[in-house]
Amino acid sequence: MKHKISRILCTALCCAPLLASAQTSEKSTSPKRLYQEGQTLFQQKAYAAAISPLQAYVRQMNADGKPLPDTGERQEAEYMLVCAAYELRDPKSIDLLRAFLDEYPDTPHANRIYALIASSYFFEGNYDDALAMFNSARLDLLGTEERDDMTYRLATCYLKTGNVKEAAIWFETLRSTSRKYSADCAYYISYIRYTQGRYD
């Protein structure tokens, strides 16, 4: 009898950690936890890793099998998903970014979305469409590093489409404000002056 009680007690002690870990697993799939995990990974620029928890968060259903109500966090999760698609150079990123703008036309992220669409067109070599989207965005409202990247692409678009006057203006502006692009801008400004026959 003593052996039976000790076996039961031993089994209970061995199974207790398994029960505790099962409860932890349930907590990790809660909507709030999924959102926080995805947001943290996104902020760390681990875009590929952020997609899975963010998609799981967006697909969450309530007890009746209906999608959870549209909250600010849901919109933010969808924003992070389309930005992750852009950062990972998804071929469908332009469509995803445009669909996000169609779904949430009043989003506070609209300016950045326009800049990302423009940048996607730039990387495809579609400079006219890139210029149209860059001109829809206010680059001065972006973060410093992203603003400089987008301004460089804008100036390059002007150069590629033959508008050397605008290209020179943007390259000169960027040269005076960005250390990262100062050498590249100086090169392009010299190139533009050379093509115009100005050797000063």
Locate the predicted segments by residue.
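Hydrophobic h-region of N-terminal signal peptides that target proteins for export
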Residues: 12-21
